């Protein structure tokens, strides 16, 4: 057969190739190793046919492809028969060098004569047989390697992403690189800072599609939407509580199906009597309010101290009327007899509508909420516990938010600004109250007359005129009033904390600091003309 020669010579480096001799060679020349670059010239030839010249070592071939003697289906196996020239061989004999390239390890299937297949990249075994490649990759290919898990060494945090672990480690190091430009707030995450800035701007991008509710946090919106989710369930026959949708319960276990063990429903997590339960003998939840009702106890537990004086009267949850002694004590419903008869007469045994639809209610006052943490925070107003104290003054509060709001009094910070006027304040509620001055809105209306105002405090003060109650009494004289501001101004007459001293006259002492002088003189003369000398000691109606 004609042989094709290579047209362009190429340098080939053969390192670590051991050159073996023919049978006629001795063992010394057989250890020859070629480590230099040989420039192959016109002697490089490619042999394409089967080996025809067996035993003929005097050919001029340098590299060829020898077919397996058995002729199996694995194809050609590369060989390295080198032919040297007469000058290089010395004796005119050809050297045959066979490659000692390390063959891949045979699997257990190949050892038994089976055809080799793809191996697992993790365990090295056949694909699909090991425990690490049982599922297989997408499309039936090789299995995908398992996803890495980045775990925290200080806590149980685990994530598939290293960036999440780096962000989490800032909670342990205390690093807070994201700081608010308007207040001392700082956070370890940018998303928290973005949520915080909405407290300064008043932005509420998350709105409920079912009601006018809007908030600045997506979590608060999802929590609110639970009140609209699903049809309302039937009310509880004992307390009237109703939830938005029933919770899915797990299937009963075999012991529960046989009746050997009572089944515990998931709804058992809901408080059955709309009150905060305190375990018997344990008051660590509210250390200063051990008289709260526990399991199986009445309103006052045995051996406990009497209840402190309430901050406001016990009122009915249905109509708001003040309850008499003995009313509302049945199951802590806080309902008057008329509302209870109305509920029973209507054929329903549920509680009143309105605040009672909320799941967690205070047993000492009409407060009710959907969230147990709000109830726990509210109970501090009854126990008198104030763990949050100001470092600059004796101020203390039961809520951390109130302390933060109070600290702005010392710093002079006023982050909330009115867009219509130069007004600024340190409380968002004050800004909303101020906005009613521009809008003219007066949402607080008296149910006994046509009076309306834009502040709830003014309505409470106005209601004292209908009831005639004057709770503020002077300890020095017989002066009584229903307004705390008037009481403080009256104390200046006696020289208690007033800058004007004891010589301050009564009409001037009653004057509000924000009222114009003409109104003050008219109000003072009218009070003196109506009540005479008694106007010095009694507030005008």
Curated annotation (Swiss-Prot):
The modification Phosphoserine is found at residues 85, 96. GO terms for molecular function: DNA binding; transcription cis-regulatory region binding; zinc ion binding. This is Zinc finger protein 513. Binds DNA. Can associate with the proximal promoter regions of PAX6 and SP4, and their known targets including ARR3, RHO, OPN1MW2 and OPN1SW. It comes from the Eukaryota. One of its GO terms (biological process) is retina development in camera-type eye. Pfam families: zf-C2H2. SMART domains: ZnF_C2H2. SUPFAM superfamilies: beta-beta-alpha zinc fingers. GO terms for cellular component: nucleus. Transmembrane segments: none annotated. Its main location: nucleus. A zinc finger (C2H2-type) spans 150-172, 178-200, 206-228, 360-382, 388-410, 416-438, 444-466, 472-494. Residues 1-120, 492-541 are annotated as: Disordered. The lineage of its organism: Eukaryota, Metazoa, Chordata, Craniata, Vertebrata. Keywords: DNA-binding, Metal-binding, Nucleus, Phosphoprotein, Repeat, Transcription, Transcription regulation, Zinc, Zinc-finger. Transcriptional regulator that plays a role in retinal development and maintenance. It comes from Rattus norvegicus (Rat). Belongs to the krueppel C2H2-type zinc-finger protein family. Residues 103-115 have a biased composition (Basic and acidic residues). Residues 44-55 have a biased composition (Acidic residues). It is found in: Nucleus.
């Amino acid at each position: 057969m004609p042989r094709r020669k290579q047209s362009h010579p190429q340098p080939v480096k053969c390192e670590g190739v051991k050159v073996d001799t023919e049978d006629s060679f001795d063992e010394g020349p057989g250890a020859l190793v070629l480590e230099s670059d040989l420039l192959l010239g016109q002697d490089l030839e490619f042999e394409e046919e089967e080996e025809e010249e067996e035993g003929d070592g005097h050919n001029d071939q340098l590299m060829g492809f020898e077919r397996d003697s058995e002729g199996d289906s694995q194809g050609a196996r590369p060989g390295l028969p080198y032919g040297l020239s007469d000058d290089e061989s010395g004796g005119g004999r050809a050297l045959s060098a066979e490659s000692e390239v390390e063959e891949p390890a045979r699997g257990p299937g190949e050892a038994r004569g089976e055809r080799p297949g793809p191996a697992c990249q993790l365990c090295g075994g056949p694909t699909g047989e090991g425990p690490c490649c049982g599922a297989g990759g997408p499309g039936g290919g090789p299995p995908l390697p398992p996803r890495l898990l980045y775990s925290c060494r200080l806590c149980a945090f685990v994530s598939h992403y290293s960036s999440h672990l780096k962000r989490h480690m800032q909670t342990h190091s205390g690093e807070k690189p994201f700081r608010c430009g308007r207040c001392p707030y700082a956070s370890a995450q940018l998303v928290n800072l973005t949520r915080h800035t909405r407290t300064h701007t008043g932005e509420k991008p998350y709105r409920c599609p079912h009601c006018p509710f809007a908030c600045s946090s997506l979590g608060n919106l999802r929590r609110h939407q639970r009140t609209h989710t699903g049809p309302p369930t039937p009310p509880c026959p004992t307390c009237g509580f109703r939830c938005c949708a029933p919770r899915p319960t797990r299937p009963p276990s075999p012991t529960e199906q046989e009746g050997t063990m009572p089944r515990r429903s998931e709804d058992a997590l809901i408080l059955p009597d709309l009150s905060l339960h305190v375990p018997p003998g344990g008051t660590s939840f509210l250390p200063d309010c051990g008289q709260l009702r526990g399991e199986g106890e009445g309103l006052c537990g045995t051996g406990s101290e009497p209840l402190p004086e309430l901050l406001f009267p016990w009122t009915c949850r249905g109509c708001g009327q003040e309850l008499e002694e003995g009313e509302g004590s049945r199951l802590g419903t806080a309902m008057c007899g008329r509302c209870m008869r109305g509920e029973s007469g209507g054929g329903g045994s549920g509680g009143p509508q309105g605040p009672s639809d909320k799941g967690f209610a205070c047993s000492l006052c009409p407060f009710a909420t959907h969230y147990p943490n709000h109830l726990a925070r509210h109970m501090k107003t009854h126990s008198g516990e104030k763990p949050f104290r100001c470092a600059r003054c004796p101020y203390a509060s039961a809520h951390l938010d109130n302390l933060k709001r109070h600290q702005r009094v010392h710093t002079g910070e006023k982050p909330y600004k009115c867009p219509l006027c130069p007004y600024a304040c340190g409380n968002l509620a004050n800004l909303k109250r101020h906005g009613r001055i521009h809008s003219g809105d007066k949402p607080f209306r008296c149910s006994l007359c046509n009076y309306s105002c834009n502040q709830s405090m003014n309505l409470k003060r106005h209601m004292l005129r209908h009831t005639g109650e004057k709770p503020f009494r002077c300890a020095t004289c017989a002066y009584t009033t229903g307004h705390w501001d008037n009481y403080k101004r009256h104390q200046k007459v006696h020289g208690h904390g007033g800058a004007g001293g004891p010589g301050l006259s009564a009409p001037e002492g009653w004057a509000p600091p924000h009222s114009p002088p003409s109104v003050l003189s008219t109000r003072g003369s009218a009070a003196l003309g109506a009540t005479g000398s008694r106007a010095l000691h009694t507030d005008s109606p």
